[in-house]
Amino acid sequence: MRSNCEEIVIRMKNLFRFKVTKDTGIAVIAGLVMIALSLLMIPFGGDSLRDTVISFILRDVLMIFGLGVVFVSLYVEKKSKEVIAELGFSRRKWALSLILNLAFAAGLLAVFLKDGKPADVISLKNLYGASYILVAGIFEMTFIYGFLRMSFEKAFGIIPSILLTSVFYSLHHAGFQPEFLHLFLVGLMYCGVFYITKNMLIIFPFFWGVGALWDVLVSSEAGDEIKNPVSFGIALVILFASVIWVLFRKWRRSSNVVKNIDSNLGNAQER
Protein backbone atom coordinates (compact mmCIF):
# COMPACT_ATOMS: atom_id res chain seq x y z
CA MET A 1 0.00 0.00 0.00
CA ARG A 2 1.12 3.55 -0.73
CA SER A 3 2.09 5.78 2.17
CA ASN A 4 0.48 9.16 2.70
CA CYS A 5 3.67 10.86 1.49
CA GLU A 6 3.60 8.89 -1.77
CA GLU A 7 -0.05 9.82 -2.31
CA ILE A 8 0.74 13.50 -1.77
CA VAL A 9 3.67 13.35 -4.21
CA ILE A 10 1.49 11.68 -6.87
CA ARG A 11 -1.25 14.28 -6.44
CA MET A 12 1.26 17.12 -6.63
CA LYS A 13 2.67 15.65 -9.85
CA ASN A 14 -0.84 15.69 -11.28
CA LEU A 15 -1.28 19.33 -10.29
CA PHE A 16 2.14 20.53 -11.43
CA ARG A 17 4.70 19.00 -13.77
CA PHE A 18 7.05 19.96 -16.57
CA LYS A 19 7.12 17.48 -19.44
CA VAL A 20 7.18 19.46 -22.67
CA THR A 21 7.01 17.31 -25.80
CA LYS A 22 6.43 17.69 -29.52
CA ASP A 23 2.69 17.46 -28.84
CA THR A 24 2.96 20.49 -26.53
CA GLY A 25 4.45 22.50 -29.37
CA ILE A 26 1.70 21.34 -31.72
CA ALA A 27 -0.92 22.46 -29.20
CA VAL A 28 0.66 25.89 -28.73
CA ILE A 29 0.96 26.43 -32.48
CA ALA A 30 -2.62 25.28 -33.07
CA GLY A 31 -3.81 27.59 -30.29
CA LEU A 32 -1.94 30.54 -31.78
CA VAL A 33 -3.45 29.77 -35.18
CA MET A 34 -6.88 29.92 -33.54
CA ILE A 35 -6.11 33.34 -32.04
CA ALA A 36 -4.64 34.58 -35.33
CA LEU A 37 -7.80 33.57 -37.21
CA SER A 38 -9.85 35.50 -34.67
CA LEU A 39 -7.64 38.60 -34.96
CA LEU A 40 -7.91 38.49 -38.75
CA MET A 41 -11.66 38.93 -38.35
CA ILE A 42 -11.30 42.41 -36.84
CA PRO A 43 -11.03 44.32 -40.16
CA PHE A 44 -14.04 42.44 -41.50
CA GLY A 45 -16.65 43.18 -38.86
CA GLY A 46 -19.01 45.06 -41.16
CA ASP A 47 -22.29 44.04 -42.75
CA SER A 48 -21.08 43.94 -46.36
CA LEU A 49 -21.12 40.72 -48.38
CA ARG A 50 -17.32 40.73 -48.49
CA ASP A 51 -17.04 41.00 -44.69
CA THR A 52 -19.65 38.28 -44.19
CA VAL A 53 -17.90 35.86 -46.55
CA ILE A 54 -14.42 36.47 -45.10
CA SER A 55 -15.70 36.12 -41.52
CA PHE A 56 -17.42 32.88 -42.53
CA ILE A 57 -14.17 31.52 -43.95
CA LEU A 58 -12.04 32.60 -41.00
CA ARG A 59 -14.28 31.60 -38.13
CA ASP A 60 -16.71 28.99 -39.40
CA VAL A 61 -14.64 27.13 -41.99
CA LEU A 62 -11.08 27.43 -40.70
CA MET A 63 -11.60 27.79 -36.94
CA ILE A 64 -14.75 25.91 -35.99
CA PHE A 65 -14.73 23.21 -38.68
CA GLY A 66 -11.02 23.18 -39.51
CA LEU A 67 -9.56 23.18 -36.00
CA GLY A 68 -12.51 21.85 -34.01
CA VAL A 69 -13.47 18.96 -36.28
CA VAL A 70 -10.83 18.17 -38.91
CA PHE A 71 -7.68 18.88 -36.88
CA VAL A 72 -8.87 17.17 -33.69
CA SER A 73 -10.19 14.09 -35.52
CA LEU A 74 -6.93 13.67 -37.47
CA TYR A 75 -4.93 14.09 -34.25
CA VAL A 76 -6.98 11.37 -32.56
CA GLU A 77 -6.54 9.05 -35.55
CA LYS A 78 -2.78 9.56 -35.50
CA LYS A 79 -2.52 8.85 -31.79
CA SER A 80 -5.04 6.27 -30.59
CA LYS A 81 -8.67 5.87 -29.60
CA GLU A 82 -7.62 6.26 -25.97
CA VAL A 83 -7.01 9.95 -26.66
CA ILE A 84 -10.78 10.42 -27.05
CA ALA A 85 -11.22 9.65 -23.35
CA GLU A 86 -8.36 12.00 -22.46
CA LEU A 87 -10.14 14.74 -24.38
CA GLY A 88 -13.11 14.21 -22.06
CA PHE A 89 -15.39 12.13 -24.28
CA SER A 90 -15.99 8.82 -22.52
CA ARG A 91 -18.43 6.89 -20.36
CA ARG A 92 -16.41 7.77 -17.28
CA LYS A 93 -18.87 8.94 -14.59
CA TRP A 94 -21.28 9.99 -17.34
CA ALA A 95 -24.40 9.76 -15.16
CA LEU A 96 -22.89 11.85 -12.35
CA SER A 97 -21.55 14.30 -14.93
CA LEU A 98 -24.96 14.75 -16.51
CA ILE A 99 -26.68 15.23 -13.15
CA LEU A 100 -24.12 17.83 -12.08
CA ASN A 101 -24.40 19.47 -15.51
CA LEU A 102 -28.13 19.98 -15.02
CA ALA A 103 -27.66 21.14 -11.42
CA PHE A 104 -25.00 23.70 -12.35
CA ALA A 105 -27.10 24.89 -15.29
CA ALA A 106 -30.14 25.38 -13.05
CA GLY A 107 -28.06 27.27 -10.49
CA LEU A 108 -26.51 29.52 -13.11
CA LEU A 109 -29.89 30.23 -14.69
CA ALA A 110 -31.31 31.12 -11.27
CA VAL A 111 -28.51 33.66 -10.80
CA PHE A 112 -29.24 35.19 -14.21
CA LEU A 113 -32.98 35.40 -13.53
CA LYS A 114 -32.75 36.92 -10.06
CA ASP A 115 -33.55 40.35 -11.51
CA GLY A 116 -36.32 39.03 -13.73
CA LYS A 117 -36.57 37.62 -17.24
CA PRO A 118 -35.48 39.99 -20.03
CA ALA A 119 -38.10 41.01 -22.57
CA ASP A 120 -38.26 39.04 -25.82
CA VAL A 121 -35.70 36.51 -24.59
CA ILE A 122 -37.73 33.78 -26.28
CA SER A 123 -37.92 34.86 -29.91
CA LEU A 124 -37.15 33.64 -33.41
CA LYS A 125 -34.05 35.82 -33.74
CA ASN A 126 -32.66 34.43 -30.49
CA LEU A 127 -33.37 30.92 -31.77
CA TYR A 128 -31.19 31.69 -34.78
CA GLY A 129 -28.41 32.90 -32.51
CA ALA A 130 -28.77 29.99 -30.09
CA SER A 131 -28.44 27.46 -32.91
CA TYR A 132 -25.18 29.02 -34.04
CA ILE A 133 -23.80 29.27 -30.49
CA LEU A 134 -24.53 25.63 -29.68
CA VAL A 135 -22.88 24.39 -32.88
CA ALA A 136 -19.88 26.65 -32.21
CA GLY A 137 -19.80 25.12 -28.73
CA ILE A 138 -18.77 21.80 -30.26
CA PHE A 139 -15.55 23.52 -31.34
CA GLU A 140 -14.91 24.79 -27.82
CA MET A 141 -15.44 21.31 -26.36
CA THR A 142 -13.25 19.44 -28.85
CA PHE A 143 -10.45 21.93 -29.44
CA ILE A 144 -10.22 24.26 -26.42
CA TYR A 145 -11.53 22.30 -23.42
CA GLY A 146 -10.56 19.03 -25.08
CA PHE A 147 -7.34 19.17 -27.11
CA LEU A 148 -5.65 22.27 -25.65
CA ARG A 149 -6.54 21.41 -22.05
CA MET A 150 -5.34 17.81 -22.45
CA SER A 151 -2.07 18.89 -24.06
CA PHE A 152 -1.34 21.51 -21.39
CA GLU A 153 -2.20 19.06 -18.61
CA LYS A 154 0.23 16.46 -19.94
CA ALA A 155 2.96 19.09 -20.19
CA PHE A 156 2.44 21.23 -17.10
CA GLY A 157 -0.18 19.61 -14.82
CA ILE A 158 -3.80 20.37 -13.98
CA ILE A 159 -3.44 23.85 -12.43
CA PRO A 160 -1.34 25.37 -15.25
CA SER A 161 -3.60 23.61 -17.74
CA ILE A 162 -6.68 25.35 -16.35
CA LEU A 163 -4.94 28.73 -16.46
CA LEU A 164 -3.47 28.32 -19.96
CA THR A 165 -6.67 26.92 -21.41
CA SER A 166 -8.60 29.86 -19.99
CA VAL A 167 -6.12 32.32 -21.52
CA PHE A 168 -6.47 30.74 -24.97
CA TYR A 169 -10.24 30.56 -24.53
CA SER A 170 -10.39 34.27 -23.73
CA LEU A 171 -8.04 35.34 -26.53
CA HIS A 172 -9.85 33.32 -29.18
CA HIS A 173 -12.74 35.80 -28.81
CA ALA A 174 -10.52 38.73 -29.83
CA GLY A 175 -12.11 39.19 -33.23
CA PHE A 176 -15.77 39.04 -32.25
CA GLN A 177 -16.23 39.40 -28.46
CA PRO A 178 -13.19 41.11 -26.88
CA GLU A 179 -14.20 40.83 -23.22
CA PHE A 180 -10.94 39.22 -22.11
CA LEU A 181 -11.05 39.31 -18.30
CA HIS A 182 -14.68 38.23 -18.17
CA LEU A 183 -14.09 35.38 -20.61
CA PHE A 184 -10.91 34.33 -18.80
CA LEU A 185 -12.97 33.89 -15.62
CA VAL A 186 -15.60 31.99 -17.60
CA GLY A 187 -12.85 29.70 -18.89
CA LEU A 188 -11.60 29.12 -15.34
CA MET A 189 -15.10 28.17 -14.25
CA TYR A 190 -15.80 25.64 -17.00
CA CYS A 191 -12.31 24.17 -17.07
CA GLY A 192 -12.23 23.83 -13.30
CA VAL A 193 -15.64 22.15 -13.20
CA PHE A 194 -14.51 19.71 -15.91
CA TYR A 195 -11.94 18.23 -13.54
CA ILE A 196 -14.61 17.13 -11.08
CA THR A 197 -15.35 14.11 -13.29
CA LYS A 198 -13.08 14.62 -16.33
CA ASN A 199 -16.08 14.09 -18.55
CA MET A 200 -17.29 16.76 -20.98
CA LEU A 201 -20.88 15.94 -20.04
CA ILE A 202 -20.40 17.87 -16.83
CA ILE A 203 -20.27 21.17 -18.74
CA PHE A 204 -21.84 20.55 -22.15
CA PRO A 205 -24.52 21.13 -23.29
CA PHE A 206 -26.59 22.51 -20.39
CA PHE A 207 -24.19 24.27 -17.99
CA TRP A 208 -22.09 25.68 -20.81
CA GLY A 209 -25.21 26.35 -22.87
CA VAL A 210 -26.92 28.48 -20.23
CA GLY A 211 -23.80 30.56 -19.73
CA ALA A 212 -22.99 30.97 -23.41
CA LEU A 213 -26.53 31.75 -24.53
CA TRP A 214 -27.10 34.31 -21.81
CA ASP A 215 -23.66 35.84 -22.16
CA VAL A 216 -23.91 36.31 -25.94
CA LEU A 217 -27.62 36.79 -26.61
CA VAL A 218 -28.57 38.82 -23.52
CA SER A 219 -25.48 40.46 -22.01
CA SER A 220 -23.28 41.17 -25.02
CA GLU A 221 -23.76 43.24 -28.16
CA ALA A 222 -21.80 40.56 -30.03
CA GLY A 223 -24.97 38.49 -30.11
CA ASP A 224 -26.68 40.94 -32.46
CA GLU A 225 -24.45 39.74 -35.31
CA ILE A 226 -25.77 36.17 -35.18
CA LYS A 227 -29.48 36.75 -34.55
CA ASN A 228 -30.41 36.14 -38.18
CA PRO A 229 -31.32 33.35 -40.63
CA VAL A 230 -27.83 33.45 -42.16
CA SER A 231 -26.23 32.38 -38.87
CA PHE A 232 -28.83 29.63 -38.52
CA GLY A 233 -27.97 28.43 -42.03
CA ILE A 234 -24.25 28.53 -41.27
CA ALA A 235 -24.83 26.47 -38.13
CA LEU A 236 -26.65 23.82 -40.16
CA VAL A 237 -23.89 23.77 -42.79
CA ILE A 238 -21.17 23.34 -40.14
CA LEU A 239 -23.13 20.60 -38.40
CA PHE A 240 -23.83 18.77 -41.67
CA ALA A 241 -20.21 19.10 -42.82
CA SER A 242 -18.98 17.80 -39.45
CA VAL A 243 -21.19 14.71 -39.66
CA ILE A 244 -20.09 14.06 -43.25
CA TRP A 245 -16.43 14.44 -42.27
CA VAL A 246 -16.73 12.02 -39.32
CA LEU A 247 -18.55 9.44 -41.46
CA PHE A 248 -15.98 9.85 -44.24
CA ARG A 249 -13.05 9.29 -41.87
CA LYS A 250 -14.80 6.27 -40.37
CA TRP A 251 -15.34 4.81 -43.85
CA ARG A 252 -11.73 5.58 -44.76
CA ARG A 253 -10.41 3.75 -41.71
CA SER A 254 -12.65 0.75 -42.39
CA SER A 255 -11.54 0.70 -46.04
CA ASN A 256 -7.88 0.75 -45.01
CA VAL A 257 -8.42 -2.14 -42.61
CA VAL A 258 -10.00 -4.23 -45.38
CA LYS A 259 -7.14 -3.40 -47.76
CA ASN A 260 -4.57 -4.40 -45.14
CA ILE A 261 -6.34 -7.70 -44.54
CA ASP A 262 -6.51 -8.44 -48.28
CA SER A 263 -2.84 -7.51 -48.65
CA ASN A 264 -1.82 -9.81 -45.82
CA LEU A 265 -3.86 -12.67 -47.28
CA GLY A 266 -2.28 -12.12 -50.68
CA ASN A 267 1.22 -12.18 -49.21
CA ALA A 268 0.41 -15.35 -47.29
CA GLN A 269 -0.84 -17.11 -50.44
CA GLU A 270 2.29 -16.13 -52.38
CA ARG A 271 4.40 -17.80 -49.74
Regions found by a protein language model. Name each.
Residues 1-19:
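Short, Lys/Arg-rich, polar N-terminal cytosolic tail immediately upstream
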Residues 24-29, 97-99, 127-130, 159-164, ...:
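Hydrophobic alpha-helical transmembrane segments
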Residues 40, 180-236:
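Functionally important transmembrane alpha-helices
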Residues 76-83, 245-261:
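Membrane-interface capping segments at transmembrane-helix boundaries
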Residues 44-53, 83-86, 113-124, 218-227:
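Membrane-interface helix termini and inter-helical loops of multi-pass transporters
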Residues 32-40, 105-114, 166-175, 208-219:
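Aromatic-anchored segments of alpha-helical transmembrane domains
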Residues 20-77, 230-236:
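Alpha-helical transmembrane segments in multi-pass membrane proteins
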Residues 66-70, 119-175, 185:
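Function-critical hydrophobic alpha-helical transmembrane segments in multi-pass membrane proteins
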